[in-house]
Each structure stands twice: as C-alpha cells, then as structure tokens.
A protein has these predicted regions:
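Canonical Rossmann dinucleotide-binding motif of NAD(H)/NADP(H)-dependent dehydrogenases/reductases
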Residues: 1-18
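Conserved glycine-rich Rossmann-like NAD(P)H-binding loop of the short-chain dehydrogenase/reductase
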Residues: 15-30
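Conserved NAD(P)H cofactor-binding loop of Rossmann-fold oxidoreductase domains
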Residues: 76-81
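Substrate-binding pocket helix/loop in short-chain dehydrogenase/reductase
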Residues: 84-85, 92-97
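Active-site helix of classical SDR
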Residues: 108, 143, 151
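Active-site loop immediately N-terminal to the catalytic Tyr-X3-Lys motif
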Residues: 86, 132-138
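Alpha-helical segment proximal to the catalytic Tyr-Lys
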Residues: 113, 156-160
Length: 172
C-alpha cells in the first residue's frame, strides 16, 4: 500500500514519522516496528477516525508533541467504497467526505504553524480517475476532487511558507 511505501522511503532518509491509522492497528504497529528497528525512536503511531472532529484535533495535538518539528504532512488516509446513486445516504457522505476531504483539511489547518516553522511540505494523495469519473463512486470522487481544489487554493495561500501539492497515483 502506498502509505507504507511512503513511510519506508522516509525511514530510509532517516526521518521521524508519525503513522496514523483508523482501524489497521496491526499494520501500523508492524510498520512502526520495522521503522524503529532500523532507526530507533523515529516512528510513532496514533489512532484517529478522521470522520470525528475531536479525534482529528487529538491527532493534531499528539503529532505536535512527538517531535520538535514537522517537515511534511502526507494526507494519504482514505475511505473508498462504491455508493450507487440509489443507495447513497448521509452516513456514506459523512464517512467519505470526512476521511477524504474534511480530515485532511483540518489536519492541514492544525499543523500549518509547525509546517511553517520548518518551511515544510504538504502532499495530498488524490485519484487518477477524477477527470473521467467512475460509476458508483460519486461521493468518493466529489471528496477527492474537493481535496484537489483545496490543494490548489492552499498552494497559493501558503506559498511563501509551505509547499502544497497533490499526487494522484494509479491503482496499486
């Protein structure tokens, strides 16, 4: 999975890494163990549901306290499942928009001062299929499309202090 590969790349560069997970605790613990076995004390894990405001705030605060600086924020967490138009619900909307759009935006907002201090970077992971659309994934696509728009706006708004980009990898 892409988040793991990103973390391992940063491990190889000797960076400190905060690994966020929602429900994949075992995977997060194994990744942290892998990173810490090569670079002791450089990986921390934090559980948070990006759909819940208080958990996003806690993730921000814990992240600020782990290390002296934050050099990069990679918004890779995502919820992805089909929502055919005849089956959409408020719950689908809240989950898909929460993890794919709202969570990343509020993480950026909460961590921007630490990122400014280090002249850091933000990378938002989007989706290659946004321009053509994907049947049955309209809510997910709307959320990821919103994240692309936020990325463009914040790239201009924060340009003097923080580099903001989006990357849209293909299927993994």
């Amino acid at each position: 999975r892409i988040g793991k590969e990103i973390a391992l790349t940063y491990r190889d560069l000797g960076w400190n890494i905060i690994i966020h997970y929602n429900s994949s605790k075992k995977d997060a613990e194994e990744l942290a163990q892998n990173i810490n076995s090569k670079n002791p004390g450089t990986a921390k894990i934090v559980q948070a549901n990006l759909d819940i405001d208080s958990e996003v705030k806690r993730l921000v605060e814990e992240s600020k306290n782990f290390f002296d600086s934050i050099d990069i924020l990679v918004n890779n967490a995502s919820t992805f499942y089909p929502t055919p138009i005849d089956e959409i619900s408020d719950d689908h909307w809240m989950k898909l928009v929460g993890s794919n759009l709202k969570g990343p935006l509020f993480l950026i907002s909460g961590l921007k001062d630490k990122l400014k201090e280090s002249k850091g970077s933000i990378v938002n992971i989007t989706d290659t299929n946004l321009s053509k659309g994907t049947a049955n994934f309209s809510i997910y696509s709307a959320a990821k499309g919103g994240l692309e728009s936020i990325t463009k706006g914040l790239a201009r708004e924060l340009a003097t202090d923080i580099t903001v980009n989006a990357r849209a990898p293909g299927a993994m």
